[in-house]
Amino acid sequence: MSSTLREASKDTLQAKDKTYHYYSLPLAAKSLGDIARLPKSLKVLLENLLRWQDGESVTDEDIQALAGWLKNAHADREIAWRPARVLMQDFTGVPAVVDLAAMREAVKRLGGDTSKVNPLSPVDLVIDHSVTVDHFGDDDAFEENVRLEMERNHERYMFLKWGKQAFSRFSVVPPGTGICHQVNLEYLGKAVWSELQDGEWIAYPDSLVGTDSHTTMINGLGVLGWGVGGIEAEAAMLGQPVSMLIPDVVGFKLTGKLREGITATDLVLTVTQMLRKHGVVGKFVEFYGDGLDSLPLADRATIANMSPEYGATCGFFPIDAITLEYMRLSGRSDDLVELVETYAKAQGMWRNPGDEPVFTSTLELDMGDVEASLAGPKRPQDRVALGDVPKAFAASAELELNTAQRDRQPVDYTMNGQPYQLPDGAVVIAAITSCTNTSNPSVLMAAGLLAKKAVTLGLKRQPWVKASLAPGSKVVSDYLAQAKLTPYLDELGFNLVGYGCTTCIGNSGPLPEPIETAIKKGDLTVGAVLSGNRNFEGRIHPLVKTNWLASPPLVVAYALAGNMNINLATDPLGYDRKGDPVYLKDIWPSAQEIARAVELVSSDMFRKEYAEVFEGTEEWKSIQVESSDTYGWQSDSTYIRLSPFFDEMQAQPAPVKDIHGARILAMLGDSVTTDHISPAGSIKPDSPAGRYLQNHGVERKDFNSYGSRRGNHEVMMRGTFANIRIRNEMLPGVEGGMTRHLPGTEAMSIYDAAMLYQQEKTPLAVIAGKEYGSGSSRDWAAKGPRLLGIRVVIAESFERIHRSNLIGMGILPLEFPQGVTRKTLGLTGEEVIDIADLQNLRPGATIPVTLTRSDGSKETVPCRCRIDTATELTYYQNDGILHYVIRNMLN
């Protein structure tokens, strides 16, 4: 193959009388062979390799290997992918900017040029994670929540404004605008990017990585992208390619159409269940089939959004006529739309009817078989048919109590002077929230229409339900108002509370005090119903043990019913003014009614709301910062502190030390999420982080959340493994971030034990089951363990992003051999761990792990090194990816 394949494949195309240069896959195919049936998602990767071919980071062999994927629908090769841009939200963005600022300090200390610490590709940071539902249920809720958000986060927002002026190619979308993935879908995403290079306009596929796992939503627009940890995103924006293995691609064939009364939410919960069962971790999923001909882009985005929940790297929908239709609706220019169509067709990236690419494996779903569903009570893949929810709730409640005897009596309480009874199974939170569904006009209009019918019949929200509406963009408010549905949602308590993530990420705010007291008094198992994408235990609210994902209209329906024990398929939701029962079917809007309402959504709404997307409110504009290349760290700050990760860094890496005499800090079960490892929600006053804040003069009311404090490593290391629902098997029957300082028997916080081990210079290990690190792309779930002194995590399997994050922080991920677990080994957590010869580590190698039991007996377990690529090994040997990037800058 020609060493100048990149040059040989360069071609031009015309769009709107403008000439664009591009790297043509059909021209490349003359050397590579027929690539017509390569999955469209891999064609995006192939173009990327072709465009970046330099003979070093991208070679002929890399391009040949990706084109040769077709032979076996698999390829064992590491490639270097360079996304066009980076997307961030503020919870992950603040610590990323802290790292960049700290890197500038390190480069300065080591005699380098600080201006090299600058993004080389566009970075958009959307502030969406900080608004909390403190106020709800009235017309003032939005203004009050915004006021509190600005008050609590003033220092963080000052820091982000400093970053905006200090770093090039770095844009900030201010708070109160929308959710990053919805803003990306509706405005930032281009499908095809173009830029002026050496006097030529170059066209290439839009692509990105994001510091949030639901970055995958943009794949609904035909834009390849996925979530990575903040540390990997920082490296990407500084010019470091994303190291990855060429993925397997699972084809998901969609046929037929959804039946009357079935929503995109029901569809995505079904797809999630099927793909989780199939096993797609580390793989691409690509959707195909004639069912796509009638699947709106908003529905595709909903499915793509939940890729982390089904475990795939991404869920890709190729560009087609429906993509262009959505781009026009959302206010993209005619020039861009024509370029997207012309480019996609020229490159073989356009979806044609009957396309059957080659896939590693396939699944098929007739959308006519999808039924009304929820997912819960603790995992998004646990789909439950609507009529089976009471049984699923009862089963989970019994499991929680470890007994079949469940007879919890209602608890009397008084609110606003009125006496009530709070039943077991009460729905205490009903939230229309999350980009997953609020990006979808059909389910939002359905919720509004259902509310209208309910109000007309005289139905009311149950008094113990905290209801909220938090759309992912202001466009939602515009079209609900245009359809005259806002007053009905308001009447049922679904007033606007903010434009941001809110309940979906755990910012549900406090429940009314009488409700919290009643739950505790009766030890009630209560529920939250939300239109989000995650329902892990302890995530939505500390007192809410069961969480259910549902479509927006079902969220409204559960607010009316107020109880998870009611069967919405057969039982009445409530009673009308005459006392007659009202069933869900009586108020569920028809497909025709929904379609008429959706027709009111216009491109003018999108253009109006996104015209000043970077401007922000008067409060945002009033935040003043001084211009400087390096940040003026405040020693008394409890939000922003200079991170210690580069304190002892030298210009050359030291050899990797073997692990001798490591103690187990925690022994955990299956599906331990990054929420368990590094919670984002509220900080308990009696926790190590709570005590730290109080010792630094912060009152309880000003604690804010762990997520908002990610710019302060002192808070975050104390919050590591601090989820109130985590279960360390070293302390049976105990919930929360507790452990033993071995060889002692006393229970203490994981943080306190880790500090004692550090004083003794004892390295630490974590033992876990399957799917360790699932959930959010939370880099503090790797940074926190690093600061606690954890050197190795040994698990049955890892979720993709977290495994990468561990390596990025210099922590070794090891996998037990097939069929071997902590249980088959009979581990107690009292074992001492030794791992030798780490200087000669190889990707994927078998590593002998020696376990010394408390009786002195030894056992060696051959574990698999989950450092998968040579590039990852280089990062590990440099003590982390950012250390490697800094050393590159210095050299």
UniProtKB/Swiss-Prot annotation:
It is an enzyme of class 4 (lyase). GO terms for molecular function: 2-methylisocitrate dehydratase activity; 4 iron, 4 sulfur cluster binding; aconitate hydratase activity; iron-responsive element binding; metal ion binding; mRNA 3'-UTR binding; mRNA binding. It holds the Pfam family Aconitase_C. Disruption phenotype: Cells lacking this gene show no phenotype during growth on propionate, acetate, succinate, glycerol and glucose. The acnAB double mutant does not grow on propionate even when supplemented with glutamate and is unable to respire propionate under anaerobic growth conditions. Monomer. Involved in the catabolism of short chain fatty acids (SCFA) via the tricarboxylic acid (TCA)(acetyl degradation route) and the 2-methylcitrate cycle I (propionate degradation route). Catalyzes the reversible isomerization of citrate to isocitrate via cis-aconitate. Also catalyzes the hydration of 2-methyl-cis-aconitate to yield (2R,3S)-2-methylisocitrate. The (2S,3S)-2-methylcitrate (2-MC) is a very poor substrate. The apo form of AcnA functions as a RNA-binding regulatory protein. This is Aconitate hydratase A.
